[in-house]
């Protein structure tokens, strides 16, 4: 069902447009002054009224990212490529997605320590998650999609790694504007990596999730037997 491909595309477009909208509002109401220095994403979203929009964007992106992580995990498992690497990807994807919500709801001007924790979860663990996806794609059986997915994922992941390193080095040496630009590039690459999942999600025919298992008590003479039935 090609409609599943719209999910990662929607996340990429929604997140990109949403963050630049926050930037535009911050510039228009003078919350940030781009003539002095280029602002970090978190700085743009730290002041009202755009802080409310920033928090909601991060929350929605968190939910969409969690959804994508689960579907991707199940897709790889259903293709018979279940492995510890896939499980590690699921765990990292979950934690990094929660980090998106944390950094959006705990602004740096209020609780900076929690905000930085969320940023570390989102950036570092998110980068690790996408590297895992790149290697899973690389070791997958050859296909028409993999011919371009492998190089695209490795290029984007390499660029993200470079941006993370440059961002911390530039910030620690006082080049805040350059570090902020690296952060924006990093986040845009993350959205691009999410969007790339559309190439694989378009092959999904059906997605099913079992939400409850109910025990049925069956009486047989004096013995009691419990059976398990999936309730979907």
Swiss-Prot record:
Keywords: Autophagy, Cell membrane, Cytoplasmic vesicle, Endosome, Glycoprotein, Membrane, Transmembrane, Transmembrane helix
Domain of life, per lineage: Eukaryota
One Gene Ontology cellular component: plasma membrane
Main location: membrane
Membrane topology: Multi-pass membrane protein
Glycan attachment positions: 29, 33
Entry's localization field: Cell membrane; Endosome membrane; Cytoplasmic vesicle, Autophagosome membrane
Topological domain spans for side Extracellular: 28-50, 105-115, 175-177
Cytoplasmic topological segments: 1-6, 72-83, 137-153, 199-232
Single Gene Ontology BP annotation: autophagy
Transmembrane intervals: 7-27, 51-71, 84-104, 116-136, 154-174, 178-198
Task performed by this protein: Modulator of macroautophagy that causes accumulation of autophagosomes under basal conditions and enhances autophagic flux. Represses cell death and promotes long-term clonogenic survival of cells grown in the absence of glucose in a macroautophagy-independent manner. May have some role in extracellular matrix engulfment or growth factor receptor recycling, both of which can modulate cell survival.
Similarity-based family: Belongs to the DRAM/TMEM150 family.
Protein name in the entry: Modulator of macroautophagy TMEM150B
Organism from which the protein derives: Danio rerio
